[in-house]
């Protein structure tokens, strides 16, 4: 009987692989809540973070295929509820949670995404009143961006036909919910701006859940409305529904029907507006006539006593005459002073005077230059004489004149200054002051 069973030795990789298999098999899907920390979002699109509570923590990873579906942006410190499976990162032997879905605690993911986008766009100024464009009073052509089969388009057309049947309506059908809806809505808004065939635009749909209305909360739609040169009226959902599009639009209507009522007045309202304008015009004309009659009466009263009017005019003429005389005297005095100043400057700047002064200066410069050159030449002569004397004293010719000669050894013509440099029989070249001679060495002595 064996005391111990046969040992099964595992490598570290095998051990981690076995643990991973056990965990993934028994924790295929779990829901975990906690606070997010150490969030990292590299360019790969994956999310890496730690989920923790007061007593423990676990590493989590959410791969790009899952993270790209998030409607909101996770942040450190945010409470989350996550769904995922437990696995092991074998190279480090660490267990982790592979997250497939997450949502914020206490508030839905879509609601949080709505709040985050609203705050960001508000900081950028997309909701500012200064950017809102006025809605035209009597539009001739109206563009509508909505579903071609929904109730919204029927409500809009019914109201427009009932209130003012002559207005033209251009419909740009789009998807208003589901994947790709936001892109279609934004493209339709830009198309209307590209062709500029309408005076005002209604963008909307009927009511629904937050998920149904979500296309109108997408950033791409908000920016298309903000960039539109054509006034935009948002008409999304019911009265209680607010979307990002409502905040960016130039005017918000609680329903599509209300949008049609806002953009086109009824015939009765137009008639009432015309009556009001007529009444205001009559009042303005009456005030204008009253002002004119007041002016006429004032002139009539003034003409009843012409001497009074002429007296005021004569007094004003006298005053103006005195002011003109004084102004002329001041002007003449200033002109005289300026003329005297210019005459003095002209005298000082007389070309003949300047030429004479220049001539005198030039003659003085020439005399000084001649004296200077004479002194320099004399110094140069003296220096040359001294140098010539020194050169003559040092010249070999002067030495030869005293009876000396220059001895060179043939054939290399090397100068001989010592008897040790020659041997009997050597040929020598002798140079005298005048001419020279060749000789042979017979004997030498020290």
Swiss-Prot record:
Compartments it resides in: Cytoplasm
E.C. no: 3.1.11.6
Any Gene Ontology biological process: DNA catabolic process
Keyword field contains Cytoplasm: yes
Enzyme superclass (EC): hydrolase
UniProt xrefs under InterPro entries: Exonuc_VII_L, Exonuc_VII_lsu_C, OB-fold_nuc-bd_dom
PANTHER family: EXODEOXYRIBONUCLEASE 7 LARGE SUBUNIT
HAMAP family listed in its UniProt record: Exonuc_7_L (MF_00378)
Record function comment: Bidirectionally degrades single-stranded DNA into large acid-insoluble oligonucleotides, which are then degraded further into small acid-soluble oligonucleotides.
Protein name: Exodeoxyribonuclease 7 large subunit
């Amino acid at each position: 009987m064996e005391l111990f069973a046969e040992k099964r030795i595992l490598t570290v990789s095998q051990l981690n692989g076995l643990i991973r298999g056990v965990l993934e098999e028994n924790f295929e899907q779990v829901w975990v809540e906690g606070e997010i920390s150490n969030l990292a979002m590299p360019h790969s699109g994956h999310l890496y973070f730690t989920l923790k509570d007061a007593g423990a923590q676990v590493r989590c990873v959410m791969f790009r295929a899952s993270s790209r579906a998030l409607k909101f942006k996770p942040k450190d410190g945010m409470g989350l509820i996550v769904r995922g499976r437990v696995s092991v990162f074998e190279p480090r032997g660490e267990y982790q949670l592979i997250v497939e879905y997450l949502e914020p605690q206490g508030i839905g993911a879509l609601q949080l995404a709505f709040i985050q986008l609203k705050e960001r766009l508000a900081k950028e100024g997309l909701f500012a009143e200064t950017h809102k464009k006025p809605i035209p009073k009597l539009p001739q052509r109206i563009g509508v961006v909505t579903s071609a089969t929904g109730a919204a388009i029927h409500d809009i057309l019914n109201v427009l036909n009932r209130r003012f049947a002559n207005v033209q309506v251009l419909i740009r059908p789009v998807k208003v919910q589901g994947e790709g809806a936001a892109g279609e809505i934004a493209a339709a808004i830009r198309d209307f701006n590209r062709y500029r065939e309408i005076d005002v635009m209604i963008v909307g749909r009927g009511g629904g859940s937050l998920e149904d209305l979500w296309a109108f909360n997408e950033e791409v739609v908000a920016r298309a409305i903000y960039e539109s040169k054509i006034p935009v009226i948002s008409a999304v959902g019911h009265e209680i529904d607010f979307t990002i599009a409502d905040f960016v639009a130039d005017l918000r209507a609680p329903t599509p029907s209300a949008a049609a009522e806002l953009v086109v007045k009824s015939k009765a309202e137009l008639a009432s507006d015309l009556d009001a304008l007529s009444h205001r015009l009559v009042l303005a004309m009456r005030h204008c006539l009253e002002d004119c009659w007041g002016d006429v009466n004032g002139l009539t009263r003034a003409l009843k006593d012409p001497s009074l009017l002429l007296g005021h005019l004569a007094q004003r003429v006298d005053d103006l005459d005195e002011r003109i005389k004084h102004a002329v005297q001041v002007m003449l005095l200033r002109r005289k002073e300026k003329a005297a100043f210019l005459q003095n400057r002209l005298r000082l700047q007389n070309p003949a005077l300047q030429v004479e002064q220049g001539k005198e200066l030039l003659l003085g410069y020439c005399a000084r230059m001649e004296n200077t050159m004479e002194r320099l030449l004399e110094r140069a002569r003296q220096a040359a004489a001294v140098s010539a004397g020194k050169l003559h004293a040092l010249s070999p010719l002067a030495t030869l004149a005293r009876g000396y000669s220059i001895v060179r050894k043939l054939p290399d013509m090397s100068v001989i200054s010592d008897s040790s440099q020659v041997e009997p029989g050597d040929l020598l070249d002798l140079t005298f002051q005048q001419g020279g001679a060749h000789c042979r060495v017979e004997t030498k002595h020290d």
